[in-house]
Amino acid sequence: IHLGKDFKLKFGENDLTLDQGFMSVGGKLPAAHDLVTPELDVFKLPKGVRKIIYTVPSLDTPVCETQIKQLSESLTHEDVSTTKYYVISIDTPFAQSRFIKENNISPKIQFVSDYANHRFMIETGLRIIELNLFARSVIECDETDTVLNVTIPVDITHIP
């Protein structure tokens, strides 16, 4: 879908709606305040690095698990020294930590949680209103935090 223009998603046969948010392709990535790592540290997305951010509804779903495992496996074979990879969800930091350990996820992926106030989820326009969860997406940003591309599948059960 086109972020900022299309606000309808599907969960199977059910219609869902995205918040509008402030993020747009060509614009700046909204500030990521109050994100928390699995180690319970406050985290801000760093400036000056190329980023690929995966937002997922919940790591405790089969689709999210498959998506992140595939990402982790792909990073074991690539040199990604110039790009940083992030997974953001509203899962608690404890749930993220468990997921990382149980699934042997690559340390090249930084997990962060927006569980506390959902600010990043709302400001990016990726909040599914009916579920109060992130839409599944991939956000690509350059070193200046300019959003280069946002991929959001129409059906949240599909991997972008």
Predicted feature locations:
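Chalcogenol-based redox active-site neighborhoods
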Residues: 1-160
